[in-house]
Regions:
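FIC/Doc superfamily catalytic core
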Residues: 1-126
């Protein structure tokens, strides 16, 4: 059983990220956000994913769906990190490594499964 990301809390986190790091505020498509946040829930309902598979599904869905005007890759990374934290894990990767890996996921240079494997090796218990 997983603790899922609350949509409103995620919107606040994304907004805070834009304030801190720059970018245009706004949601481009609510349906795409809902789809991205539902992706890991559906994965868990119809499969046997671990916490890292679900975190990767958050990252992939948010980065690929582009629900926001700006900061979609950042949103994907934040979604993965938030989900991991809610479920007892914390990221341990360097900022550079995390950025390069997230960019590779968004560019389809690594798969969602590859990203889940990367998360497994770059986390620790919270």
């Amino acid at each position: 059983m997983f603790v899922w990301i609350d949509r409103r809390a995620f919107l606040l986190l994304h907004g805070e990220s834009l304030v801190l790091h720059g970018g245009a505020q706004g949601l481009r498509d609510e349906g795409l956000l809902d789809s991205a946040l539902s992706r890991p829930v559906n994965l868990a309902a119809y499969g046997s994913p671990d916490v890292f598979d679900c975190a990767a599904a958050h990252a992939f869905g948010l980065a690929k769906n582009h629900p926001f005007i700006d900061g979609n890759k950042r949103a994907g990374f934040l979604g993965a990190g938030m989900f991991l934290r809610l479920n007892g894990h914390r990221l341990t990767a360097t900022q550079k490594d995390a950025t390069l890996t997230m960019l590779a996921l968004a560019a389809s240079e690594v798969t969602e499964a590859d990203y889940a494997a990367w998360l497994r090796t770059h986390t620790a218990p919270a």
